[in-house]
């Protein structure tokens, strides 16, 4: 049984708007185990950004516990939180956030500064990560010479630099065209399956979410639904559409007669 890398217990977050209290998260509970790929979905204002900021130790809960690798970050001072962010997490952003004056390799090396690695070790590690995400031969290119999809691959390589406990991905396909969206989500899914990388992803993209193991629907600050993603359903020999039993090699579900692909809207029923 995989151990939890994230445990959230009765999490509440309230903001003050003048003298009025505005609840953003309400009694939320969540456990993510090592090696999981989890998608968090929900409409605007549902609390996704607030939740991601709290998981990422950028914001603090009003009440409740947030345990990252067993450490309660909700009670830690800021001068210790930056070490948690550096050592325990990797971040992937919608807008890539690469430094334009650094090469792809140098962007990946940056999080390793001050972590005890020599410059040659940093360079070797960065080159290995860029090769892993399919960018061999592009490591000396600056961001402006890379496509949007390639820039996001660099960002994913950077997020892995310090072997984090998990990756937080905030709308990682949001600024990409349809082809690059598919390539990036397949890359994340492959990292999860082959490297055991734990990924927590916030997304509006139903097809991206469907490629995860577990999908959570957030509404009004609460998790109101949970569903298996396509990969977990297929792994468990279940149709992703109706949940009926399937066997290896099936292309059509024998129960609902639908193709064995992810439904376009996972929470529509």
Please place each PLM-identified region on the residue numbering.
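Residues immediately within or flanking Cys/His clusters that coordinate Zn2+
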Residues: 236, 250
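Cys/His-coordinated zinc-binding microdomains
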Residues: 243, 257
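Short cysteine-rich clusters marking metal-coordination/redox-active sites
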Residues: 239, 253
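H-loop (His-switch) and adjacent beta-strand-loop-beta switch element
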Residues: 215-228
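ABC family nucleotide-binding domain
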Residues: 4-218
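Short Cys/His-rich micro-motifs in 6-15 aa windows
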Residues: 258-267
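ABC-family P-loop ATPase nucleotide-binding domain
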Residues: 1-14, 225-234
């Amino acid at each position: 049984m995989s151990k939890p890398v994230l445990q959230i217990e009765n999490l509440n977050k309230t903001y003050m708007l003048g003298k009025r209290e505005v609840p953003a998260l309400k009694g939320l509970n969540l456990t993510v185990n090592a090696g999981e790929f989890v998608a968090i979905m929900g409409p605007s204002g549902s609390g996704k950004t607030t939740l991601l900021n709290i998981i990422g130790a950028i914001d603090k809960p009003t009440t409740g516990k947030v345990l990252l690798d067993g450490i309660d970050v909700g009670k830690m001072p800021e001068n210790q939180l930056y070490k948690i962010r550096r050592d325990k997490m990797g971040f992937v952003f919608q807008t890539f956030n690469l430094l334009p004056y650094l090469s792809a390799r140098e962007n990946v090396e940056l999080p390793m500064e001050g972590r005890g690695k020599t410059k040659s070790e940093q360079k070797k590690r960065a080159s290995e990560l860029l090769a892993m995400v399919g960018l061999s031969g592009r490591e000396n290119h600056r961001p402006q010479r890379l496509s949007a999809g390639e820039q996001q691959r660099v960002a994913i390589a950077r997020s892995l630099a310090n072997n984090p406990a998990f990756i937080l991905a905030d709308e990682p396909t949001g600024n990409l065209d349809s082809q690059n969206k598919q390539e990036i989500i397949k890359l994340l899914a492959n990292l999860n399956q082959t490297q055991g990388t734990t990924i927590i992803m916030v997304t509006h993209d139903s097809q991206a979410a469907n490629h995860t193991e577990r999908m959570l629907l957030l509404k009004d600050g609460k998790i109101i639904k949970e569903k298996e993603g396509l990969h977990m359903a297929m792994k468990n020999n279940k149709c992703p559409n109706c949940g009926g039993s399937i066997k290896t090699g099936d292309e059509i579900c024998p129960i609902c007669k639908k193709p064995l692909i992810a439904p376009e809207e996972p929470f529509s029923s």
